[in-house]
Amino acid sequence: FDVFTKNGEIYGFPFRGDYYVMYYNKDIFDAAGVAYPSNDWTWADFEETAKKLTSGEGANKIYGAAFHTWQACIQNWGVQDGKHTIMDYDTGYDFFKPYYEMALRMQDEGTVQDYGTLKTGNIHYSGPFAQGTVGMMPMGTWLMSVMIQKVKDGESNVNWGIATLPHAEGVEAGYTVGSMTPLAINAASAKQDAAWELVKFITGEEGAASYAKNGAIPGRSNADSIAEIAKMEGMPEDAAEALTVKNISLDRPITDKVGEVNQMLGEEHSLIMLGELSVDEGLAEMAERAAEIVG
């Protein structure tokens, strides 16, 4: 509730939570003779393994990994340790730098598909992974239900697994990035009492159980709800361990001007990934523009 509290007032109750994990294609790992990811991988492990998984050329190429085009799929790793947020522009956003360097390095080496191709093709975030053309992809827990349904409907035959999100050296395993979705009551509502009963139900234990049975992580998450999700038909083995995390840093803090800053970070992200700005130039522009936005 602290996330949705300001000046002592609660402005919303969390009913759903999502966070990033790492999806992987077991068949691609098996074909390369590489052991499946553990729940204590570093980003260096991720990058090195992507090289081992990459194979083929042209239309038959298998990419070792994938980063979707959202800026979150690079910038989130900079706030994963909980020490910074996207509003910490006074640092010059230096905490993003290692991850931009990693992504560009992998792009140059051909172990991930290049940003420009994904962007111009307007490729859905689930596309490359569901098609079986990438070995690993960091993505939110919302993809679990998507993959279950795609496999069930025959749209995908990927033999997939999940692992806890990789972390930086010196950061404890189980640290990830995510967000909470709140429910709130309109102050102008003529049915405040009825709305409150609905909010209590959805954000309470019964609502949490219902969300878990449908593969969504409830705001009121605990070992029981994780176990419920993990035993769903179509979920990979050992999912419960991968989903048991120690800390979830917010991808976007709830504060003034965060929406405008986030939009700006997306614009600069594209310029860096397309090579129109160097990493240092892009980070400097981010910091300068964020300071102007916040005022």
Annotate each PLM feature.
Residues 32, 109-112, 150-217, 277:
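Extracytoplasmic/periplasmic substrate-recognition and gating elements
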Residues 33-38, 104-120, 133, 153-159:
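A local structural motif
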Residues 163, 213-267, 271:
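Long, aromatic- and glycine/proline-rich binding clefts that accommodate carbohydrate-like moieties
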Residues 50, 88-119, 165:
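Glycine-centered hinge/linker elements that transmit conformational signals in sensory
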Residues 41-47, 116-131:
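Short helix-initiation/N-cap motifs at beta->coil->alpha
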